[in-house]
């Protein structure tokens, strides 16, 4: 299944706020159309909805998300928490959380077009996994800096998660550590996502 490129408002009406996909928020009462089913059908619908929220927020294909679930399942810690850590430490998401892009698709474009450096080297892979002490910067030219300047200027410093630091003058971000669960930027029940995939096998 390919990455979603359709109407974004349609998705947030159905799934609720997806800040990684769009800054728009659903009008009160317009999202999460409730269809009541009995027993197993209702439980399946809830698990599917949480999986879709995760997929669309981070801008993943079904295959990519499944691969992350498999990797997380091999860890000795909670599969759900490891899954969220893997997704949050992607380079495209780090750029988004730093405020260097307004959405994850926007951050992905910056990476694909070779505007972003990690520890002084160009990285053009959005799924690149960042680690503690990584330094994220733009290329040292006017065009690259101009692409992130307005986003950084308009971003709310109070929303910056504690595992990241941003130098707004140097257009430089720092990964301080692996994020804690409470800093995830999406309202999600990750256990239901893991449960969804465990029931597919």
Curated annotation (Swiss-Prot):
One of its GO terms (cellular component) is small ribosomal subunit. Keywords: Chloroplast, Plastid, Ribonucleoprotein, Ribosomal protein, RNA-binding, rRNA-binding. The keyword Protein biosynthesis does not apply. InterPro entries: Ribosomal_uS4, Ribosomal_uS4_bac-type, Ribosomal_uS4_CS, Ribosomal_uS4_N, S4_RNA-bd, S4_RNA-bd_sf. Transmembrane segments: none annotated. It is found in: Plastid, Chloroplast. The keyword Amino-acid biosynthesis does not apply. Residues 89-157 form the S4 RNA-binding domain. Residues 17-36 are annotated as: Disordered. GO terms for biological process: ribosomal small subunit biogenesis; translation. Signal peptide: none annotated. Its main location: plastid. It holds the Pfam family Ribosomal_S4. GO terms for molecular function: rRNA binding; structural constituent of ribosome. Part of the 30S ribosomal subunit. Contacts protein S5. The interaction surface between S4 and S5 is involved in control of translational fidelity. Belongs to the universal ribosomal protein uS4 family. One of the primary rRNA binding proteins, it binds directly to 16S rRNA where it nucleates assembly of the body of the 30S subunit. NCBIfam families: PRK05327.1 (NF003717), rpsD_bact (TIGR01017). This is Small ribosomal subunit protein uS4c. It comes from Agrostis stolonifera (Creeping bentgrass).
């Amino acid at each position: 299944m390919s990455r979603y490129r359709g109407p974004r408002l349609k998705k947030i009406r159905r799934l609720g706020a997806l800040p990684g996909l769009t800054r728009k928020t659903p009008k009160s009462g317009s999202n999460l159309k409730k269809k009541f089913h009995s027993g197993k059908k209702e439980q399946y619908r809830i698990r599917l909805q949480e999986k879709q929220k995760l997929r669309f927020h981070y801008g993943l294909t079904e295959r990519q998300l499944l691969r992350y679930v498999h990797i997380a399942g091999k860890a000795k810690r909670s599969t759900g928490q490891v899954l969220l850590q893997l997704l949050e430490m992607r380079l495209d998401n780090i750029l988004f959380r730093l405020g260097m892009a307004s959405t994850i698709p926007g951050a992905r474009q910056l990476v694909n077009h070779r505007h972003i450096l990690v520890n002084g080297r160009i990285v053009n892979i959005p799924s690149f996994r960042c680690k503690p002490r990584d330094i994220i910067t733009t290329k040292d030219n006017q065009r690259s800096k101009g692409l992130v300047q307005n986003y950084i200027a308009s971003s709310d410093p109070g929303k910056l998660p504690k595992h990241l630091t941003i130098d707004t003058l140097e257009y430089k971000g720092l990964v301080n550590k692996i994020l804690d669960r409470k800093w995830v930027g999406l309202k999600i029940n990750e256990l239901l996502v893991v449960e969804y995939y465990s029931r597919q096998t």
